[in-house]
Amino acid sequence: MAENNNEEILLLKKEVNYAVKLLKNGQINEALKIVEALIKKSPNVPLLYNIRGVCYQTIRELGNAIDDFSQATILKSDYAEAYCNLGVTYQEKGDLVSAVNAYKNAIDNDNNYPTAHNNLGKIFLASGEIDSSIEHLECAITLKSDFADAHNNLGSAFLRINKLNDAIKSYKKAIALKPDFAVANNNLGIAYLRTGNPKLASKFFENAITITPGYATAHHNLSGVKVYKEKDKQLNLIESLLIENNLSQKERIYLNFALAKAYEDLGNHEELFKHLNEGNRIRKKEMSNSIADSEEHNELIKLFFNSNNIKLTYRDSLPIRPIFIVGMPRSGTSLVEQIISSHHEVYGAGEVNNFHNIIMPIIEKHAVNENYNLKNDEFALIRKQYSNSLERFYANEKVITDKWILNFKTIGFILSAFPESKIVHLKRDARATCWSIYKHYFSDEGNRWAYDYQDLARFYKSYLGLMDYWHNLFPGKIYDISYEDLTSNQEKETRNLLKYCDLDWDENCLNFYTNTRAVKTASAVQVRNKMYQGSSDVWRQYSEYLKPLLDALK
């Protein structure tokens, strides 16, 4: 900073400190007036633009905030704090590319800036760049060991790659540093749920709600692990929250789904469907794509495959052989993965969207040019990229399961790139499957068709059509297993399943409920219990309310 700027700051120090005090006290307009007057007197002082930027950021005038933080960095090119504030503002605006660049500039000018490392790690976490996320979050903690938010974010990064013990340790550290950290309590509950401990999960969801009674996500999570009884205090709390006008749409979705679960437990069908329909209605409004887009995409995929362009020969051997478990959500895929991954030679990776993320850009590129023939080297690249993506699981087993169920869309690409892979397809009664889908909230944006009876039925039929297509194109390559048969003839179906997967018999596969691996899906509790029958008939008691869905499925 130039000497005259330093002198100006010294002269204006009293007024600057007063403006900062007002800002910290929440008196934003008063602080703005003082800073604007100071900028008119001293237009080349970067600190003033940074302070005014924080004022604008606080009152959500993000465009003005970006202008001021940018001006501060122009006047002082090594101004790490202004770059970091600029990153926060871009992040709040949804411009993550610009946010990443701003945080990197902050770190380039001050590598010992824990906030910048934490914020950058959080973006990498959201984008699925887990290794980079962990690197920056650990750096933030090294620089500031009592950084509760960084410990919480690191826990979430570990959770993404199924390192549950590390995740739990990080969340506990965050809570120890900040006992009233509601988000960390909720996240610790999620981690315990994935280990198969609903009792501990419930405790931390309840802690989160005690700290923040309006925490909609925690209410929804708690609803999934408890059985409600009459006069439950949580019911009254959620009902009162829904009356408030300042709730976000996302919060209303979580609370309606939570109430629906509660009224399902209580046997109040009318209230169950009142809240279930409302939650689904709001959730559908959030979705940008229509069911027609999903149907068209399924038809588009078929164009890439015919008897002339399927190549199934590779000379290289894979370090670990994949088993892809596919089907509709809520069809029993989590149960089957739990069974297979109980085998001593199998690592259960859970829902891995790696193949989807690799193949979709390739599909889009070819579709734009109406070129539906993939070259051998493209399949070889897909094979290499997906194989490399599995390395982050550090699995020592010979076989790995991938339960990204919507991989049913890309079976042709999977078998072309991995002819040695196994495809296990779950089949379940359509009515049971669709009812179970409709009553569950999916955080994944890919299930845009799940929140409306007609959309759900249309997608189900499109799914059946695509599976028929793959069966005809790859006869004998896809193993169908019926959920109903599996639950009624457990040992017979398990033996047949393992035989198809080229796995020797392992008694542990019958005792799948003792498997302690992480389970990320809504079935995390169910797969810890012994197999039970009858779940495919539960929809019948709601047939009066489900008539539009049942008619659409015919």
Predicted regions and their residues:
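Conserved phosphate-donor/acceptor-positioning beta-strand/loop module used by diverse small-molecule
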Residues: I414-I437
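PAPS-dependent sulfotransferases, especially Golgi type II membrane carbohydrate sulfotransferases
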Residues: S223, L235-N246, L255-P322, N369-K398, ...
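Structural signature of tandem alpha-helical TPR/SEL1-like repeats
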Residues: K24-K33, T58-Q71, Q91-N105, T115, ...
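Phosphate-binding active sites in nucleotide-utilizing proteins
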Residues: D316-S416, L426
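Conserved alpha-helical positions within TPR/SEL1-like repeat arrays
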Residues: V16, V20, K24, L47-T58, ...
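TPR-adjacent "capping" and linker segments in tetratricopeptide-repeat scaffold/adaptor proteins
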Residues: M1-K14, I238, N246-S248
